[in-house]
Structures are given as structure tokens and as C-alpha cells.
């Protein structure tokens, strides 16, 4: 248990992931929530880091090769700071998570920046192509079983690669 007053709950509330890239449009209203630290020093991050949230509209959409939405822009806002990467972007109409914040352009102020989020459907399709299962399949799986499979099937090859670059010729354990 990580709680002083008792065990953790069996389940936690969550927002579903939007897997249909055809439901993401310029102008859609979204909620951004993060822990931006762009204007805090190292000591302040430890003591004064607070959640920030704001609403925004999707300003632009981008595709990589598929012709479908892979990345979208939500413009500049209070969340457009370092430390926001990995934070959720939630569709205000459906409550579904559209994607996660991954990049921001540079700018003197947050209003001058352009914040970007990668679409979950793109991540899920990339995972399916690369590792054989979607993001939702991974998230709904058994973490202990996945860890055991990783330890058995992937870890030995990674340790071999690491040992090639270790001064001692030994992989870290």
C-alpha cells in the first residue's frame, strides 16, 4: 500500500481514449491539464509545482503518412511550458482523451507558443505495427504477465546490447 490510511482502491476513475481519428476537428474544444514547470527553478519545482488546467480549441491538425490526424495544435496558453509533456488533452464534448502533449514551439511567453499533442489512435496503430498489440490492449492487459514476458523475451537481448557498450563488458543488473 502506498497510502498511510489504508490500501489503494481496486480501481481508479479514468477517461476513455479516443481511437477514432475521424472525430478530431479544427475548432474542437479541449481541456488541457498538466504540471508545467517552465518558469520554476529546481528548488521551486520541489515546493511550488501545481496543476494547471485550461481550455483551448484545436487550431490545426497534422498527418504523417496516412492522411489521418496524427498530431494537433492547441495554440499558446498557460500549459505551454516545459513539464507539460505527457499530459492529457480531453475532448470537452465527449470526455475522451484525444492525445497527450508532446511538443511546444519556442516563444517568449506562453501565448506566443504553439502546443502540440499526439493522437492516441496514432500511438496505438504504431504499437500494433511494432509490437503486435494496440495501446488499449496493452493498458487492459495483465502488467505482471507483460513484465514476465518482457523479462523472458526482450530483456536478454537488451542486456546483450548493453554489455557490448559497457567498459567492463558486463551488462548492468
Where are these regions (language model features)?
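Solvent-exposed, polar/charged alpha-helical surfaces in well-ordered, non-transmembrane soluble domains
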Residues: 15, 25-28, 156, 160-163
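Short glycine/Trp-rich loop-beta-loop segment that forms part of the substrate-binding cleft
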Residues: 17-50
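PDZ/PDZ-like groove recognition
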Residues: 125-173
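Active-site region of chymotrypsin-like
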Residues: 2-15, 42-137
